[in-house]
Regions:
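Mature extracytoplasmic or otherwise solvent-exposed domains
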Residues: 2-376
Length: 376
């Protein structure tokens, strides 16, 4: 059990490319660029505020554990945990032993049994501590959840709901865009308490319509109050000149390459617990019509507990699945001006750990194949 609140690291980065839709369209480019920059500035300030609140939640979490366990018992647990790790769970050397892995597994299992005895001797039950851990893990996940869009209008719909003209590829009255797209944007921000910095891969490619990301968080020496909060945005965009003013009707054809989670968990002590959430979203923004970004959850996973070196994983969306997303803007776009339509992904990867080692991988990868637009 280590005090890892002091081992907090954060990173923020972003970029975008916005070529003009036509010669002399400087006003539109500057306007959309300003919107993108202001949205990022606002999200950074919001993240800064949430990190302070997260630190307060972790402090309260620690206080409640101390009140439940008592200072003397907590010191015993600390010493036991430290001695077990230093001695490699009582096994000095494994590198030249062909049975080393099996011996280590047995030694760790024995250490867990002894840790439960420590709790019982202190008149404590593992379930009591786990209830505390899960309550505070939920508080952190709620804190890290983004604000809901002011008007949530983006929907994931079956092909049967798609207009016949779109499915048949008719260009009247629709304007259709396929890769390569005009612009692109990406951003990520993460904070961790313990473990390694997350390994990140972007799938963004405006030439092919590829969006999404891969993130991996490894923490093989999880302390009392470890965790990760990661957000990753990618998008491609197109300029649109409407035939007249009015709300924009948008249909998006997207092909899912990977909507997959993989979470390895390894219990360390009888009081251990963990929760890992992964959420993938498709997003749409129409500048300047929509102030914030609309999104529809495409998949999610929640993995929890303290198993004995177990990996949980699944393709939540079958690879190569084609899904349709639909949005009609609540506000009209003006006539005689360019609007910028941005389509992509917003992913959130959160882990909260208490003495559970983990290797958690999120993959959310899509191809935006078609964007259909018409003005009502």
């Amino acid at each position: 059990m280590a005090n890892t609140i002091q081992n907090n690291r954060s990173s923020v980065d972003f970029g975008f490319h916005l070529p003009p839709p036509a010669d002399g369209a400087n006003k539109e480019v500057l306007s959309v660029s300003q919107i993108l920059l202001e949205r990022k500035r606002s999200s950074i300030m919001e993240r800064k505020d949430k990190i302070v609140k997260a630190e307060n939640i972790i402090t309260d979490w620690r206080k409640e554990v101390i009140e439940k366990v008592g200072e003397t018992n907590l010191k015993k647990f600390h010493e036991y945990s430290k001695n077990q790790r230093r001695s490699n769970f009582g096994i000095k050397e494994l590198s030249h032993d062909p049975d080393g892995l099996a011996k280590l597994t047995l030694a760790k299992r024995k250490a867990r049994e002894n840790s439960i005895d420590l709790l019982k001797n202190a008149k404590l039950e593992p379930g009591g501590l786990k209830n505390i851990h899960r309550r505070y893990a939920k508080k952190l996940d709620d804190l890290f959840s983004p604000k809901e869009p002011k008007t949530s209008r983006l929907e994931m719909l079956p092909e049967s709901k798609v207009p016949k003209g779109v499915l048949e590829g008719k260009s009247n009255p629709w304007t259709t865009r396929r890769p390569p797209f005009d612009g692109w944007a990406w951003s990520y921000s993460w904070s961790r308490w313990g473990g390694h910095d997350p390994d990140l891969v972007s799938y963004l490619n405006a030439a092919t319509g590829s969006v999404g990301h891969r993130s991996e968080y490894q923490n093989y020496d999880a302390g009392d109050f470890d965790g990760l909060w990661l957000e990753y945005d990618t998008s491609v965009g197109v300029w649109y000149w409407p035939p007249h003013a009015g709300p924009v009707d948008i249909w998006i054809k997207a092909r899912c390459v990977k909507g997959r989670y993989s979470v390895w968990l390894d219990d360390e002590w009888g009081w251990s617990d963990s929760s890992t959430w992964m959420r993938g979203n498709i997003t749409v923004n129409v500048s300047p019509s929509i102030v914030d970004e609309d999104r529809a959850e495409s998949w999610w996973s929640h993995t929890w507990g303290n198993p004995d070196s177990t990996t949980y994983g699944s393709d939540v969306i079958a690879p190569n699945s084609v899904l349709w997303f639909h949005l009609v803007t609540s506000d009209p776009i003006p006539a005689g001006a360019w609007s910028y339509i941005k389509v992509g992904t917003y992913d959130r990867h959160t882990s909260v750990l208490n003495d559970v080692s983990t290797d958690a991988i999120m993959r959310d990868w899509w191809y935006i194949e078609e964007i259909w637009m018409d003005v009502h």
